């Protein structure tokens, strides 16, 4: 029957290539992480937006740190433009709550179109290392309200994986997810299908 067939397909071993386990956040973990920064401070508001945007858009850390003010287009169809691997440009639609955070944040920045979206106090773009450190710091703080984050290694790429899994859970096909993430090869996107044990269980029910 269909269940037996699906079980057989899932039992087929993957190609003998080096694989990396995909680490992603649950909805509760993502919510706790985004809520961790102290938004009474300028740095806290910056960090909250960075975490939120990383999870909503799935941008690579290099793409996040290279965003400029004019990378954001606010309007009836708000979107973000970024330059990814191979200098390939892609456009990502923005959710309403993301637009609200961006609008508030942009009002705090100098009106310089080519200025960094995520600057330091000195006005220079955040580095990849700085993003990694702030994510680790806020993850530790968020563990106080979400115990499953305790001891969890959350990196910039974890935010990207979280976005991909959210899209997958929403029923988005892997071809569309590949375009969203800027994958040049759809096989790269297939790792999320294999990683999603919850989806496998639902399929077998």
Language-model segments: residues:
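Conserved catalytic core of the tyrosine transesterase superfamily
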Residues: 1-205
